[in-house]
Every structure is written in structure tokens, then in C-alpha cells.
């Protein structure tokens, strides 16, 4: 599972 930081970055990237 990816860390929350990565999830947030992915959301911003999208």
C-alpha cells in the first residue's frame, strides 16, 4: 500500500 503522501500527490497530479 502506498503512503498517504503518495496518494495525496497522485490526487494533485490528477
UniProtKB/Swiss-Prot annotation:
Keyword NAD: no
UniProt keyword Ion transport present: yes
Domain Transferrin-like: 7-14
Subcellular location field: Secreted
Listed transmembrane segments: none
Alphabetic keyword roster: Disulfide bond, Ion transport, Iron, Iron transport, Metal-binding, Secreted, Transport
Superkingdom per UniProt: Eukaryota
Role played: Transferrins are iron binding transport proteins which can bind two Fe(3+) ions in association with the binding of an anion, usually bicarbonate. It is responsible for the transport of iron from sites of absorption and heme degradation to those of storage and utilization. Serum transferrin may also have a further role in stimulating cell proliferation.
Quaternary context: Monomer.
Protein name, per record: Ovotransferrin
Provenance organism: Dromaius novaehollandiae
Amino acid at each position: 500500500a502506498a503512503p498517504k503522501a503518495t496518494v495525496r500527490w497522485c490526487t494533485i497530479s490528477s
